Each structure stands twice: as C-alpha cells, then as structure tokens.
Amino acid sequence: MTNKDESVEKNTESTVEETNIKQNIDDSVEQAEESKGHLQDEAIEETSDENVIEEIDPKDQKINELQQLADENEEKYLRLYAEFENYKRRIQKENEINKTYQAQRVLTDILPAIDNIERALQIEGDDETFKSLQKGVQMVHESLINALKDNGLEVIKTEGEAFDPNIHQAVVQDDNPDFESGEITQELQKGYKLKDRVLRPSMVKVNQ
C-alpha cells in the first residue's frame, strides 16, 4: 500500500470517528433537554398544587367547618334518640308488669270473702225462702268469680293432679287405692293464681 492510500484510509477513519462523537454529543444534549423539560414540568405541577392548597376559598373552609359541626350534632342526636327509645321500652315494660299485678293485693283481700260465700252455699235447707236466698247468693258468687277471672284470676287445679309444692300445700296424707302415689285425693281449700303468680296455694290431701 502506498503512502497516499494510507493517508486516505486514515482520513476516512477520522471522519467516521468524528461523526460518531458528534452523534453521541447530539444524543446527550437531546437527553439533557428532555430531562430538563421533565423537571420543569414537575416543578410547575408542584407549584400549581401548592397554589391550590394555599388558595382555598374562605367560604369553602367555612362550609367544611359547618359540615363537620353538622355531622357531630347528628351523631349526638342519634345517640340521644337511641337512649330515649331504650328508656321508653323500659318504662313500658315496667308499666305492663305493674298493670298485670296491680290487683294482686285487692284480690288477696277478697279471697276470704269468697271462701265464706262458698261455705254458705254448702248449707242445705228445705225452706223456700232459704232456697231463694241461696240462689241469689249463688248468682252473686258466679258474677264475682267471672269478673275476677276476666282480670286474670285462675283457680288452681287439685283433685287427681300430681302434687306440686309450688302451687299446692299438703295438709294431710291419704291412703286411697283409687289414686296414684303423689296424687291429690281431696281439696281442703281452694288456691288461686293471678296469671303466673300464686296468690294462695291450695290446701290438699295427698296420697301416699
């Protein structure tokens, strides 16, 4: 190869190298410009957000405060309303209980009078005047018992029933083959309940 050819080859290589270097520089400049642009955009966005935060309308702030106050008052109202409803239910329940048993003392005081009327009805007589009087007493007794039953009074069942210490009072033991052991063979005095509460237990004779 001649000196001329070598010179041409070197010039060509230099030109290619310069071109590559220039291209790299251009690429770097372009990337730098893009990065700068992104940074500027981000800075503008941050500045814009700060301005939005700083420039809250006083009216909007007042509305937010009023809304918060309204929410707090609503919560207080709901809590008070729930407490009031619970109070009403409790009072209503107490009133129902009092109403159910308000006649208990009066009925208890009436029971001895009923016993006396029933004893009088057991007396026998042939006189027409006596029979007429007894019939009148019987009508009064029936009316009284029906009125008391309408108010919750209930006669406790006895004869033939199994003895229950909760509603029966055993006075005498019996030995009757017609009844099972523990069954009531005879009622000595009537017992009464007011709904589910015993006013007076029945006095009974219980089979052994």
Curated annotation (Swiss-Prot):
It comes from the Bacteria. GO terms for molecular function: adenyl-nucleotide exchange factor activity; protein homodimerization activity; protein-folding chaperone binding; unfolded protein binding. Residues 42-55 have a biased composition (Acidic residues). Transmembrane segments: none annotated. Residues 13-23 have a biased composition (Polar residues). The keyword Cytoplasm applies. PROSITE patterns: GRPE. InterPro entries: GrpE, GrpE_coiled_coil, GrpE_head. Keywords: Chaperone, Cytoplasm, Stress response. Residues 1-12 have a biased composition (Basic and acidic residues). PANTHER family: GRPE PROTEIN, GRPE PROTEIN HOMOLOG, MITOCHONDRIAL. NCBIfam families: PRK14140.1 (NF010738). Belongs to the GrpE family. Participates actively in the response to hyperosmotic and heat shock by preventing the aggregation of stress-denatured proteins, in association with DnaK and GrpE. It is the nucleotide exchange factor for DnaK and may function as a thermosensor. Unfolded proteins bind initially to DnaJ; upon interaction with the DnaJ-bound protein, DnaK hydrolyzes its bound ATP, resulting in the formation of a stable complex. GrpE releases ADP from DnaK; ATP binding to DnaK triggers the release of the substrate protein, thus completing the reaction cycle. This is Protein GrpE. It comes from Staphylococcus aureus (strain JH9).
